[in-house]
C-alpha cells in the first residue's frame, strides 16, 4: 500500500512538472478527459446505407478520410454530398480544388450552398497543403475537401522540364504535410477528406496491381478509407440516367471495416436517397415487397422501384418515417453513434432486383 502511495505521489509530481513546462492539458488521466471519452461525432454522407456501413452515422469529425476510385466513379459527388450535409447542420466547409475542375452548378444541384463554400484553386501542391493547414488551424472549418492528391504537383516538378524524373517528391510532400496536420485536425475537430486516384503498379504478377498516388503516408494517417466503384448503368429506356455504385470501407479506425454497400448516383441530382431507403427498408421488411408492388403500413405506395422513389420524393413525411425506422433498426441514434448490440452492416441490395423492379 505504501509503495502504491509513493508511486501515486511520484506520478503527480511528474504530471505537475510536465504541465509547468508544456502547459495545462499536455498530460491528463484518460478518464478525466471529456473530449476523448465522448462518442465519435459524425457528418452524414448523403447515403443512408453508407452511414450505417461506416458504423458511426457518417464520416467522423477530427479525422482524415481518403476516398479513392477509378475515374467517373462518384468520388467528387460523394464529397459534395458530405459538404452539403455539414452545411445543413450549420457547418463551414472548404474545398481545395487542385484539379481546377469543380462544377459549381452541379454542386448547387446536390444541395451545396456555394455562396458559403470557401474555395481555393492553388498553383502548387505546397500551396494547397499550406492553405489546408491554415484553414484547419483556424478551428472554424467543419469539413475540408482536397481534390485531389494526384493533382498536388510539387513546386520542383512545375519548375522543371517535361520529362524530368522527380522520384518520390509528391510522397515526401504528403508525408510532411500529414505529420503537421494530424494533431491540428484532431484538436480543431475538422473532417479533412482527401480524394485520390488509382494507378497501376508495374510488374505485379499476383495480387492487386492497383495503388493510390502520393505514397503510403495517407494510408496510415487516414481513419477511414473508402473505395468507390461504378458497377452498372441505370437506364430509362435506352437513356443512361445514372450509375449503380459500390463503396467498400477498406479501413475504419472507429468501427469494424470491410463493409460493402451499393446505391444509385443519378446524373444531375447525385445520390438517390429515396432509392437507398427503399433497398434498406425492403431488406428489413419495413417496406413490404410483393412482386413489383411495395407497401408500407399495409398500404401500397407504388409499383416498381422508380415509381416508389417518385412517391417518396412527393411525400417527404412518409420517407422520414421510413428513414427513422431504418436507422432505429440498424442502431443509429440521434447522436450518430450506433448501439453496440445491434447489427451495423447493411445487407447489400442487388442490382438485378433494381432492374427487375423498373
From Swiss-Prot:
Alphabetized Pfam families for the sequence: RecA, RecA_C
Basic residues compositional bias, start-end: 340-351
Keyword DNA repair set for record: yes
Region (Disordered): 331-358
GO function term, MF aspect, one: damaged DNA binding
Keywords, ordered alphabetically: ATP-binding, Cytoplasm, DNA damage, DNA recombination, DNA repair, DNA-binding, Nucleotide-binding, SOS response
CDD domains in alphabetical order: RecA (cd00983)
GO CC terms in record: cytosol
GO biological process, one term: DNA repair
Location (main, coarse): cytoplasm
Localization: Cytoplasm
InterPro entries: AAA+_ATPase (IPR003593), DNA_recomb/repair_RecA (IPR013765), DNA_recomb/repair_RecA_CS (IPR020584), P-loop_NTPase (IPR027417), RecA-like_C (IPR049261), RecA-like_N (IPR049428), RecA_ATP-bd (IPR020588), RecA_C_sf (IPR023400)
Entry binding sites for ATP: 69-76
PROSITE patterns per record: RECA_1, RECA_2, RECA_3
Organism domain of life: Bacteria
Biological role: Can catalyze the hydrolysis of ATP in the presence of single-stranded DNA, the ATP-dependent uptake of single-stranded DNA by duplex DNA, and the ATP-dependent hybridization of homologous single-stranded DNAs. It interacts with LexA causing its activation and leading to its autocatalytic cleavage.
Sequence similarity: Belongs to the RecA family.
Family matches, as HAMAP family: RecA (MF_00268)
Note: There are two genes for RecA in M.xanthus; recA1 seems less functional than recA2.
Name of this chain's protein: Protein RecA 2
